[in-house]
């Protein structure tokens, strides 16, 4: 054996080198794979933490906003049964300015506590809508609960008023639908609505909280 090694020293060195090289390659690959796996793990963990923190922020902001809306409704109309959560959810779902909605709900029926709304529960004095034709569900415009009247009102805005890139604040100049029909007959309706919105923005943090909630929703991919 010793003679073989002496006679074939070059070959033995090459074989040893190849063996060591292969061994080191495997070890190096194992270390690299472990580092990659750990990096993926930590990156995934950081992403999860980031998402969870954003979700907690979103939920907290939403709770604050609902409380602010309920507080405003109760201060303006203590006997109102309108739930702020319903208002917030619909404004977020349809991307409607929440101060505009609150202002109109207060002007139209004092949040369901005055006028015909006491019998119809139609906070915005809008008839029911089934997605196809106005007045199809309920020709009398009656709802079981004031909360049920919020979405039909917002759908009406989206379908007939907020068209051709018009915004809620365009309605403060001339509140008409695509046919030119006014939402209300009062000639100073736009001024009343504008003043009410300004009051809400100046006396509450509803607008600021709503905008923060929308931004947080964009971060989380919530439409």
Residue ranges of model-derived segments:
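Catalytic cores of secreted/periplasmic lytic hydrolases that degrade extracellular macromolecules
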Residues: 2-102, 106-223
């Amino acid at each position: 054996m010793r003679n073989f090694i002496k006679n074939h020293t070059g070959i033995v060195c090459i074989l040893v080198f190849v063996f060591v090289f292969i061994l080191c390659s495997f070890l190096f690959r194992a270390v690299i794979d472990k580092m990659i796996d750990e990096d993926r793990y930590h990156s995934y963990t950081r992403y999860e933490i980031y998402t969870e923190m954003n979700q907690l922020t979103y939920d907290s902001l939403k709770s604050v906003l609902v409380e602010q809306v309920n507080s405003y409704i109760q201060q303006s109309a203590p006997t109102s049964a309108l739930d702020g959560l319903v208002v917030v959810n619909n404004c977020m779902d349809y991307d409607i300015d929440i101060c505009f909605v609150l202002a109109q709900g207060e002007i139209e029926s004092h949040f369901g506590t005055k006028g015909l709304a006491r019998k119809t529960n139609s906070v915005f004095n809008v008839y029911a809508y089934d997605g196809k034709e106005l007045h199809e569900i309920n020709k009398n415009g009656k709802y079981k609960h004031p909360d049920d009247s919020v979405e039909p009102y917002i759908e009406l805005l989206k379908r007939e008023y907020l068209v051709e890139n018009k915004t809620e604040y365009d309605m403060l100049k001339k509140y008409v639908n695509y046919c030119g029909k006014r939402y209300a007959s009062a000639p100073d309706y736009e001024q009343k609505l504008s003043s009410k919105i300004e009051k809400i923005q100046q006396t509450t943090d509803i607008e600021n909280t709503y905008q923060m909630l929308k931004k947080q929703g964009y971060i989380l991919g919530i439409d």
